Amino acid sequence: MSDRSDPTHAIWQKVLAALTADDRITPQLHGFISLVEPKGVMTGTLYLEVPNDLTRGMLEQRIRVPLLNAIGSLDEAAGVSNFAIVVNPGIAQDAFAQHPEPAEQPYIETPTITAPTDNPGLPASPSRGDSRLNPKYGFDTFVIGGSNRFAHAAAVAVAEAPAKAYNPLFIYGDSGLGKTHLLHAIGHYAISLYPGIRVRYVSSEEFTNDFINSIANNRSSLFQSRYRDNDILLIDDIQFLQGKDSTQEAFFHTFNTLHDHNKQVVITSDLPPKHLTGFEDRMRSRFEWGLITDVQAPDLETRIAILRKKAQSEKLQVPDDILEYMATKVTSNIRELEGTLIRVTAFASLNKTPVDLALVQTVLKDLITLDEDNVIAPVDIINHTAAYFKLTVDDLYGSSRSQAVATARQIAMYLCRELTNLSLPKIGQLFGNRDHTTVMYANKKITELMKERRSIYNQVTELTSRIKQNHRYGKM
């Protein structure tokens, strides 16, 4: 932090005053400016430090002209005619450390919740172990490309300086493009930078279920502390709250409490705020307070890099020309791309053959011919799976834990994940309102079994072929 008695500080305050009065500086841009530390003046240049490349880029591009105008309005005695930017990641940590947590204040009670009597046994705040972060999703495993570069930079900046630049950070894009990965990566990176920081990841479905349970069990205090006693709240698939007025009200108060206490909120959605239906205007406006960025389908180079990274992480030996071939054939999303790699290598492992072009073409012949504009309905997947295993649809929706039914259900969940753009919570809803973690487990288990058991691999492959052929030709 700069010394307030330093002449440089006085110069910077005058620059800030001019920028504050400039209509071109939006609240979002003010967030970037708030991260700047003036360091000194040398030969007419005002040197400024920022915590990351994203902030430097914004200052040198979108804010450059207003900043030069503000410098031009200074007295000649200031001796400043230009500025230079230096990136110093250390000031992000300093800034966060210099803002201690505010004193505890009573929360405003959500109108739809009746507050229970205080229970001294309730935890005061979530522990680090309760963050619910996936250890596989870090910035080190995220592949950066033109389709996600800005979203990645924004996510890194938020982790380095929570609630300092853009709050909330709102990331939108189609399913399977890396939004959830970025949420978890923010949490992991922030924890590595600030030991003891309180981070919680939650899907909107989980938030809704917790809210409903808190009403049913008269545990509103626990619900509030779980989501409000955090330094960073990461909420996935906010569109799931569409039309859920009471849950939106609970989230509205949670958001306000965190924002008012300078705590970071990061939100993902399949649509930008202005296109979200079923939300009150006041909620959508809060989504737009900070930075809005999107992730798009990866280009060819990025798809190749994603496959290469996945092969390395799974210790799979796949020639580069094979990775390039797969990348040219699977273009829709990252999830399908990685699933294709797993299926190819599983086939090679089961047959004890090398991964070559002929093998890839054989495995993918029924997977890569479907027009990506044609969307497979999850009900078709469920119907085909039930018929294939000689079960009823109710068996797959039901609670039976017999091995035959459970395996069929897990395969159906896996195929819904692979062949549709549905989120984990929505797939869970299809299967008797199961939790999204059940879908995650099913996806992981079937992926592993395909590598180990030829019967499972053959079943998944044959089912996939039948589903796609039926979709293509319109017959069961």
Curated annotation (Swiss-Prot):
InterPro entries: AAA+_ATPase, Chromosome_initiator_DnaA, Chromosome_initiator_DnaA-like, Chromosome_initiator_DnaA_CS, DnaA_C, DnaA_dom, P-loop_NTPase, Trp_repressor/repl_initiator
Keywords linked to the UniProt accession: ATP-binding, Cytoplasm, DNA replication, DNA-binding, Lipid-binding, Nucleotide-binding
Binding residues annotated for ATP, in chain numbering: G176, G178, K179, T180
Region of interest: Domain IV, binds dsDNA: 349-476
Highest taxon listed in the record's lineage: Bacteria
Region feature (Domain I, interacts with DnaA modulators): 1-87
Stretches the record annotates as Domain II: 87-131
Biological processes annotated in GO: DNA replication initiation; regulation of DNA replication
Annotated stretches, region: Domain III, AAA+ region: 132-348
CDD domains linked to this entry: AAA, Bac_DnaA_C
One GO CC term on file: plasma membrane
Compartment(s) where it occurs, according to its Swiss-Prot or TrEMBL record: Cytoplasm
Signal peptide limits: none
Pfam families assigned to the protein according to its UniProt record, in alphabetical order: Bac_DnaA, Bac_DnaA_C
Gene Ontology molecular function, alphabetical: ATP binding; ATP hydrolysis activity; DNA replication origin binding; lipid binding
Primary role: Plays an essential role in the initiation and regulation of chromosomal replication. ATP-DnaA binds to the origin of replication (oriC) to initiate formation of the DNA replication initiation complex once per cell cycle. Binds the DnaA box (a 9 base pair repeat at the origin) and separates the double-stranded (ds)DNA. Forms a right-handed helical filament on oriC DNA; dsDNA binds to the exterior of the filament while single-stranded (ss)DNA is stabiized in the filament's interior.
Subunit structure: Oligomerizes as a right-handed, spiral filament on DNA at oriC.
Family: Belongs to the DnaA family.
Comment field on protein domains: Domain I is involved in oligomerization and binding regulators, domain II is flexibile and of varying length in different bacteria, domain III forms the AAA+ region, while domain IV binds dsDNA.
Name of the protein in question: Chromosomal replication initiator protein DnaA
Organism: Clavibacter sepedonicus
